[in-house]
């Protein structure tokens, strides 16, 4: 690895580090590209080097989260940083009083940190929408104490971006439930509103199209076609740039890759 460091730029090395951290393994491919070809060169990385990389990435993620939290606070929203899924679960439960009524959209991130399981086992009134009709679920969610969600993207300065097909999720974020708790992986942080919208439309939407087996172009191509299909998942776009109601919106930023 040291010999490789001498021949590649720090920027390319950083990309390799991110790939190692993401895949959680001790080898990676260095991608070298010019105008005529792209070549992948296997690179071996020791366990100690991976630990150093992971530490540096974690420090960067924490700094980034602090920037986002500052932006959220300037918009009358609360932000928190969790260094792990376990910390995220602990923080989420601190925001959810026992015996409260909790609703949720199809939030993969909440499941990934173990929050749904904890609510089902604990002293909470967790509304399982799979046991209700869509209309019953929506009406119950509007009157809930807590609504759980993730975001399709969040900007460095604290703007939340969400796209919805049936609009149950974005409508509950906008109004209704007394408190909204977001579980957001650091992978969803984007530099600005434009890049956040691109992520929502070209990453989150195509993946969810696969997840729900929708008959729309992005399911086949992996990118947005701005379609008007009856199955389109991009019916409503919600940009949350400020919360008029203090203590309503809480965002937990997690040092992990969560959701889509």
What are these regions (language model features)?
Residues 28, 38-52:
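Short, Lys/Arg-enriched N-terminal segments with co-localized hydrophobic residues
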Residues 52-61:
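Glycine- and acidic-residue-enriched helix-capping/strand-helix junction motifs
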Residues 2, 6-7, 34, 41:
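Polybasic, lysine-rich low-complexity intrinsically disordered segments
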Residues 61-148:
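N-terminal active-site beta-alpha-beta segment that forms phosphate/nucleotide-binding
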Residues 142-260:
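Conserved phosphate- and dinucleotide-binding cores of soluble alpha/beta proteins
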């Amino acid at each position: 690895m040291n010999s490789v460091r001498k021949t590649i730029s720090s920027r390319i090395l950083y990309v390799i580090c991110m790939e190692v951290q993401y895949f959680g393994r001790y080898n990676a491919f260095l991608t070298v590209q010019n105008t005529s070809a792209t070549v992948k060169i296997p690179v071996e990385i020791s366990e100690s080097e991976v630990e150093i990389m992971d530490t540096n990435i974690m420090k960067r993620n924490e700094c980034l989260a602090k920037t986002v939290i500052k932006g959220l606070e300037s918009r009358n929203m609360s932000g928190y940083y969790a260094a792990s899924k376990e910390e995220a679960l602990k923080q989420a439960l601190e925001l959810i009083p026992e015996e409260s009524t909790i609703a949720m959209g199809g939030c993969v991130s909440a499941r990934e940190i173990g929050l749904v399981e904890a609510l089902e086992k604990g002293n909470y009134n967790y509304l399982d929408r799979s046991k209700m009709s869509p209309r019953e679920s929506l009406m119950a969610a509007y009157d809930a104490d807590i609504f759980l969600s993730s975001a399709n993207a969040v900007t460095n300065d604290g703007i939340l971006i969400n796209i919805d097909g049936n609009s149950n999720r974005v409508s509950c974020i906008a109004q209704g439930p007394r408190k909204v708790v977001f579980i957001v992986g650091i992978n969803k942080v984007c530099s600005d509103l434009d890049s956040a919208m691109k992520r929502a439309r070209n990453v989150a939407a195509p993946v969810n199209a696969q997840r729900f087996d929708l008959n729309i172009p992005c399911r086949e191509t992996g990118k947005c076609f701005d379609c008007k299909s009856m199955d389109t998942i991009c019916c409503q776009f919600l940009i949350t740039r400020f919360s008029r109601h203090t203590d309503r919106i809480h965002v937990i930023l997690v040092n992990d890759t969560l959701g889509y």
